[in-house]
Amino acid sequence: MKPDLYGCCGRVLLLLLIAAAPDRAQQDSGLARAPAPDTAANRREAGTRAETDTTGYEQLRTVKNDAFALGERLVFDVNYGFITAGEAVMEIPSIDTVAGRACYQVDFEVNSLSSFAWIYKVEDRYKTFIDVESIAPWKFEQHVREGSYRRDFIADFDQIHHVARTTEGTHPIPAYVHDIMSAFYYVRTMDFAGSHPGDIFMLHNFYKDTTYDLGVKFLGRQELEVKAGTFHTIVVEPLVKEGGLFKSEGRIVIWLSDDERKIPVRVNTKVLIGSIDTELTQYSGLAGPLTARIR
């Protein structure tokens, strides 16, 4: 069976990464239920960022970042029903120089547990290099190993001349376009204090040969208990459309810690049979205190 775009299990964790710049309302949710009313309240920005965009062609913005730092490490269980099928790790092991810019190296790995690998073995590796100042990517790598399926993809993003050079071709990109990993780290710099249920904001994400738009709905706030603790969380939902970046048989809901760190706490997504839950089990090396943790 050939996985879609990002791979089966890898795609579940990558759904953690789908929120970014809120610049316009999503007009068509692509979901069965009615979309949120097109009101001024629902068109407000879901978050605001302390950033400065300059008008010079070769000038990059500066984004204030108190959300993450070198050394952060997040560990998750990937559960299918009552079975823990795999483990995922997101971490920032180093700061490297890419295209002459200081960049966070961010690694993301998804592995099936040995007890589940005999059914379906997963060894997925993703890597992105995110500009320390602009929180925009300069390079993205994907190495998927799922069952007999193999895929390797690399994209170099020229954030000055707005071109993506990939293993599959060269393509124009908008300013500050994201890969699926850098998008998540960008949203963590945002302030959701003024967000209201029903607010919709957008991600602009490049993959393969296309820049995709994906609407994300702010659902509200909730107290949530997982292995890593009990947290105050922000709850969001990607508005999945047929033919879009993600394809899903059902609803996807994401919980982020409701504080300056905005670390992913849980993801629930429907599959053909049942659902997959991804839950935070460990965290370390955070940029500051995790005030959303209750106990």
What feature does the model see in each segment?
Residues R11, D23-R24, A88-V89:
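N-terminal processing/targeting junctions
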Residues Y149-D191:
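Hydrophobic, well-structured mid-protein blocks that either form specific transmembrane helices
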Residues L15-D23:
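Hydrophobic h-region of N-terminal signal peptides that target proteins for export
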Residues M1-V12:
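Bacterial N-terminal signal peptides that target proteins for export
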